């Protein structure tokens, strides 16, 4: 039996799981998520979204901030943010 995917809701408050952190690699000028014994590059809007995760603000508050900051429709921002955060929660990079 497979486990149901982790779906992040707008009321969820997320932070990085223990041992995981976002870091800018100045040499390569890329953002990476450092994890125990591995690291992976995050591109596009992902670094900006991940920098807003502070363990205090809800996902909905982050979506609202991004919609205002980028003058973009909230629904578009929400779809992308929820997809990214759900994927990273599924991979145990983020937790509630």
Curated annotation (Swiss-Prot):
The keyword Nucleotide-binding does not apply. InterPro entries: PQQD, PqqD_bac, PqqD_sf. It comes from the Bacteria. Transmembrane segments: none annotated. One of its GO terms (biological process) is pyrroloquinoline quinone biosynthetic process. Belongs to the PqqD family. This is PqqA binding protein. It comes from Gluconobacter oxydans (strain 621H) (Gluconobacter suboxydans).
């Amino acid at each position: 039996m497979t486990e149901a995917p982790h779906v992040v809701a707008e009321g969820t408050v997320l932070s990085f799981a223990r041992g995981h952190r976002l870091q800018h690699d100045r040499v390569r000028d890329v953002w990476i998520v450092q994890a125990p014994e591995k690291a992976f590059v995050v591109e596009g809007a992902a670094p900006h979204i991940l920098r807003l995760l502070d363990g205090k603000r809800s996902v909905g508050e982050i979506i609202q901030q991004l919609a205002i900051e980028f003058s973009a429709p909230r629904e578009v921002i929400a779809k992308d943010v929820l997809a990214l955060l759900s994927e990273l929660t599924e991979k145990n990079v983020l937790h509630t």
